Every structure is written in structure tokens, then in C-alpha cells.
Amino acid sequence: MAASGGEGSRDVRAPGPPPQQPGARPAVRFRDEAFLNFTSMHGVQPIIARIRELSQQQLDVTQVPRLQWFRDVAALEVPTGLPLREFPFAAYLITGNAGSGKSTCVQTLNEVLDCVVTGATRIAAQNMYVKLSGAFLSRPINTIFHEFGFRGNHVQAQLGQHPYTLASSPASLEDLQRRDLTYYWEVILDITKRALAAHGGEDARNEFHALTALEQTLGLGQGALTRLASVTHGALPAFTRSNIIVIDEAGLLGRHLLTTVVYCWWMINALYHTPQYAGRLRPVLVCVGSPTQTASLESTFEHQKLRCSVRQSENVLTYLICNRTLREYTRLSHSWAIFINNKRCVEHEFGNLMKVLEYGLPITEEHMQFVDRFVVPESYITNPANLPGWTRLFSSHKEVSAYMAKLHAYLKVTREGEFVVFTLPVLTFVSVKEFDEYRRLTQQPTLTMEKWITANASRITNYSQSQDQDAGHVRCEVHSKQQLVVARNDITYVLNSQVAVTARLRKMVFGFDGTFRTFEAVLRDDSFVKTQGETSVEFAYRFLSRLMFGGLIHFYNFLQRPGLDATQRTLAYGRLGELTAELLSLRRDAAGASATRAADTSDRSPGERAFNFKHLGPRDGGPDDFPDDDLDVIFAGLDEQQLDVFYCHYALEEPETTAAVHAQFGLLKRAFLGRYLILRELFGEVFESAPFSTYVDNVIFRGCELLTGSPRGGLMSVALQTDNYTLMGYTYTRVFAFAEELRRRHATAGVAEFLEESPLPYIVLRDQHGFMSVVNTNISEFVESIDSTELAMAINADYGISSKLAMTITRSQGLSLDKVAICFTPGNLRLNSAYVAMSRTTSSEFLHMNLNPLRERHERDDVISEHILSALRDPNVVIVY
């Protein structure tokens, strides 16, 4: 890997191939800023070249949608008046089997091209963020819904209320787009009205006009300032920045969202009159995913029956591949790349099986026999005593919840020391006024609050995994003062179990719990500073300085362990003392001690103030043999070598300047790494694997509860769904920043007042690196839509976590799991679901399932498979191995 500078960089030429011969084919070259995985560069080059070509093609003036057309749309009440109108776009597909490198390819696209990277879901977006920020700092990655203007009140919108019939077969592009806009009309109309209302009725917003005028005034080249518009105007929509939109896991989106993204891109760019709009450029949608793995699901809630029905719909990838009109319009064979080979599990036989399922190839007896080796009785998988540490995958939330209840009952009986079962309360605040209005609109005057809450439990929370939890019975309390009904439920959790957060939650990182080796690794590669210190590196350095200062004593604590070699221990004490004296420039000669101490006091920075023990005189009236001071009691049992004099000569204070922050961090880092090297050399693996924990304040674990004075001094960050967490317990310690956010967001609803009087605990999580965090309460608002009326029905307060011990197959999409046990439902078996479940594993050695899906009666989407096989034979389609 190498990167060369821009035009002003020094011309340093590396030895290369001989000069090109006349008539030879010119070599394909990349710009200097490209960072590529050279093992797949040959396949990635044509992908980037084609996407760049599509993004630079100019439209005819008559093809560009005008701003007035969107104003006309906002004036409509029903979509029957929508005229036929083409919204030009281009598309590029990146598909392939599970773990083949599709998402990794996006990292190259992001570095080489200026594009807007998004995900179909929050998990997909955050997974992409992890990949992009792994090598470079990356701006946060949002969902495609966030980028085109989707809001919380759109979640419950009733789709497909206005029937639409295509005018011809095959339908024209304009007809297909009008059908999609009609289907999504409630959301489209609201987004359009909001955008134009914020616009204020002007011909165009002036952000880009002002920058263009400034370019002309200063004599700068075209685009010199307008390309920096997202920096000078931070609130600009992302669609104004680029016409290349990358959507990861696009197979999870319904087909109508293809037109929605194109429509919103044109509306936003017409509204701001961006340079790309003035240049007549069209949006290019780069759709990443696997059409045979994923499916688009849509849910409809029937209010009279209080029942949620879920149906499968055509997804974006299948829509582009199978629809003749779109296939020809996008020239799909010239805009399609297929990634082959599973890089998640590299076993040859297993990889062949994945290709058979991905591409719809014939299933032979050999394939069935290969899968037979993974089959075990279902009772073996569902018995919590078996397969400890394995992740169970089920077809439905109901099965997951049943297994979790069985697991918790098993742990309560066995009382295994590490895994302790405990419960935490979850609260739902229902507005009495809105509930009465709901009963009136749905003509259900006898509907009870308990029945409504039970029926809507999966809709009230902001994540579907809430249905997987082992919950108790709902208890309702009426609070007349706030006009609220508070529904309380108890959720069971397992201490020290693996969990995932289900939303972007704020967290306060307050300590570290791991080993000496893991903390040293954090300091060595600056991984913590890189991921947590994006807004201000100084905050991350201050936090790590506090942890290192509190953790230095653990090197001396390690030397107190029984069983260590006495000679090595004595040598360690001596070398640690020498290191401290060298770092703090201590003078050991008694003759010059006074002069040196005076000089040190004047020259030393405020953070290195020495403590003078000489002023401690004897107490009046005390016996001669009694210690004169509390410090004497502490130090009486220690000889001079066992005393960590670092704490006697260095006081941790708040640095006031950036230079002081870096100086403090550098000193403490040298002290920590120096001590680490000394003890590693003397004690090796015994020392490196020894437990190491340090916190910003004193911490006590009492069972599942964490007690601490205050997490003040911790570091504010965000808990991501892509991180791996261990549940370490809970705490009632208040975090000021969390309480302030609660008051700011939910003061009017009375929820903040109630939670301040009867606060919920915060959960304590440890991430995969060992950092301990207090995580904010997950609060979600539920807005019900009935016809054209929106009712702010409820606010839910819980912890926003789901267990990794068991999950649905759908939830596992995109994850890599070490050990997997799958329970399929025989009656309704889809082969693409079996493919998703089996492809999660990183090794077939750790894969079990209750039946062989290849031998059972199953559904298989052969239509999409035929198109994929045809594409594999098409010379215009790019194949990446």
C-alpha cells in the first residue's frame, strides 16, 4: 500500500516496467489518491471506471426536472393528478455470495470517488462505517432513509392506499416511476411539503450561488469553493455533495424506494441549484447486496384485529435485474459486477455449496450428504446445557423468546458463577388523551390499555429484537398529573453475556477491564484515539492519561502476587524505581536533595508537584512507638523498593493547553510502556495475561450492580450496533449529560420529570477492546397513523440491547459468527433463508442444524437465479474473484 501526494508533491519515481512499446494497449492508471487492495485491483478498476463514466454523463436540457414540477406535486392531495414524468438516473449493481468482499469494495469506491455512502438499515450503515473508518477517519454513515428525508412519523404510514394500474406491458420507465410514487404517496407528499416549506418559496436557495459569486470575485477556478459547500454549510443535505449514492444491503429495500431516492435527489438538487444540477448530471445509484440472500418485507397493522401482518415484496436488486424496462434503461449488463468466492469461510466444499445456493445451480446427492454431517436433534440445540458459547439462530422472534426463557431458567437452577440472571424494569408511557382519540377513530370504545400495549409491543420500541426478550407481565399505573399511563415490565438479562446495542446510543466510557497485554495494545496502535477522538483528540488523550495514572499502581500490585520468583521480584522493584527516577528527573543524592527539590518545585510543571514528607511532625501526647500519621500506617509494611514513588512526586492535574495535554499523555505513556517492558522481560506470559483494570474513579461491583462516586472524567462517545459488547451489570449513578439530554428532548411529555423522580438504571457494557461504559437509556417515540391523523401514542424507555446468545436468521444478516446452531421451521422453509443462516459461520466445523434444508420441501427463487447465471455468461458483466 502506498499513497503519493497531489500536484505539489515531490516527484519520486519507483522502479517500474520497461517503457511501453508503440501500438501496445495503454495501461489503466489510477489517480494518486487511490488506496487499493492490490490482490483484487484488476477486478475493481473497471468498476470504478464505469461508475465514474456514468456520473459524468450530461443530460439534455429538456430531461432535467424543474423545481416548479415539485411545487406542483406538493399542491396535490391525491396522486391521481401526477403527470407522467421521467426522473433520469443510472444504476450499477455490485452483487455476490456471502462474504465475497462486496462491502469491502465500497471502501475503495469511497476513497477514489466522491460519493454518498449509505446503508439500507442502521446495522448495514454502521457496519459500513466500521469498514471505512478502519483505515481512515470517516464521516458518520447514515441509512438511505435518513438521506432522502424519511422521518419518524413516516414509520406508521399506510402504503399502497391508492391503487394503480400500469398502462402497458412492458411498462415505460415513466409509468413505473409514477406507480412507485403513488404507492409511497403519503411519505413522498410529506417529504416534498417539508422541503419546500423550509425553502421559503424562493427560486433557489443561495448557498451555492454565494460560493459561485465568491469564486468569480476572487478569480478562482470553477468549483474551487462550491466543492467545499458541505464544510462551509454543515447542514446541507448529503445529496447536494455528490451524484453517486452507494446503498449497502440494497436487497432489503422495497422496489418503490428506488424511485423515491431518485425523486428526492432531483428535488433536493433543484431546490439548492447545485453545480451538479446546473451541470445536468444525473444520480448514479450503486446498489450493493445479494438478491438471493435478502428479501424486502413490509408490515401492515390491522387496527380492528390488533394484528400485524408481514408480507414479502419485490426488492430493489430483483427489480433492477428482472424488470425488462429497467434492465434495458440502465444497460445492466454493462453496469454489473459479480463477486465470487466466500472469504468468510474458505473451506473448498463449503464454498462450493454456497455457490450452488447463491446461483441456483442443481442440488446433487453429494451436496445433500455434505449438509447431512451438520444435522443434530433439535432437542440437542434447544437444550441450554449443550453448546455453550454458540449462537442459536431461529426463524421467528417467538422461538428466540422461548429459548431465552428456557436459558434463563437453566441458569437460575445451575447458578453458574460467571453467568448470573437479573431483571431490569422497562417503562412505556402512554398518553391518555391520545389513547382515547385512538379508540374513537378505530371505533373500539371497550379497548383496554393492557390489550393495546400487548398487541403493539413490537411496534412501540424502535428495534424488532425487543420481541426476543424474556419479559414478564405488564403492570399499568395511572398518573393523573401527567395524564399518562405507565406500563412497567421486567426484562431478564444474563451477566457477562454477549449483547449488541440496537440503536446509536450515547455512552460514557469510564474505565478499562482486561489484561496488561490488551491495554498495552490500545496504547501502541492508538486505536482508541482513532475511533473515539474524532471530534477532539485532546479529550481522548486526557481520558487515557487518567486511566494510565490510575493503572500504574497495578504493576506493583502484580509483584505482590504469591509464587513469583523472589530474585526476579527484587530486580523488578529496582528497575521500576530507576525508571520512575529517570522519567521524573529525581535526584537521589542526599547532599543536594534540598537544592534539587527547590529547583524541581520551581521548574516542574503543575502536574508534577512533589509531596514533602518532612513537614509531618510527631503528634502531641502520642506514644513513641505509635505511628505519627495515617500515611505511616499505610507505608509501615512496605520497604523503600515496594513503594511506588511515582505517586509521591506526580499529581495528575487538568492541563489547560493542547501542548500540556500531549506532554502529560506522553509522560504517562512512557511510564506505562516502560513498566510493561520491564515486567514482560522478567515474567513473560504470566504478567501479560494478568488481569488489569483501571477507572476514572473508585469502582465497586456488588453482584450485578456497579457502585461509583461519579463517572466524571470519563469520555462521551457513541455505542455502535457493529461493536461487540459484554453485559457487565447496571448502575444507578447519574450521568449529567444523559439527564440533560432527557430533559431537552422529553420535558413537554412529562417523561423527563417521571424518570428523574423514579430513574431507570443505566446498563454497564464492556466493548471488544476492554473499555467499560455506562450507556444512556434508549428512548423511542411511537406515533400511530390512522388515515390522515397522527397520534403521539407512547414513549418507551428501555436499554436498547439484544442478546447474541440467540437471534432470528433475519437479524444475523451481514454478521460473521464463530459457532452457529440453527433451528429451521420445517413447514415454511425458504432456501434463501437457509443460505443466509449457513453462510454466517466462519468454519463449518462449528455448524449445527436441526434438519437438512436441501432434503426438506422448500421454496426456491429460480427466476432471479436464471438471471444471475445468464449474467455470469455475459462477457460485459465484470466478474471479481
Curated annotation (Swiss-Prot):
GO biological process, one term: DNA replication
Signal peptide span: none
Pfam families: Herpes_Helicase
EC number(s) on file: 3.6.4.-
Keywords: ATP-binding, DNA replication, Helicase, Host nucleus, Hydrolase, Nucleotide-binding
Principal location class: host cell
One GO MF term: helicase activity
EC category: hydrolase
GO cellular component term, pick one: host cell nucleus
Protein location: Host nucleus
Residues that coordinate or bind ATP: 96-103
Annotated spans, Disordered: 1-26
Function: Component of the helicase/primase complex. Unwinds the DNA at the replication forks and generates single-stranded DNA for both leading and lagging strand synthesis. The primase synthesizes short RNA primers on the lagging strand that the polymerase elongates using dNTPs. Possesses helicase-like motifs and therefore may act as the helicase subunit of the complex.
Family to which the UniProt record says this protein belongs: Belongs to the herpesviridae helicase family.
Quaternary structure, from the entry: Associates with the primase and the primase-associated factor to form the helicase-primase complex.
Protein name: DNA replication helicase
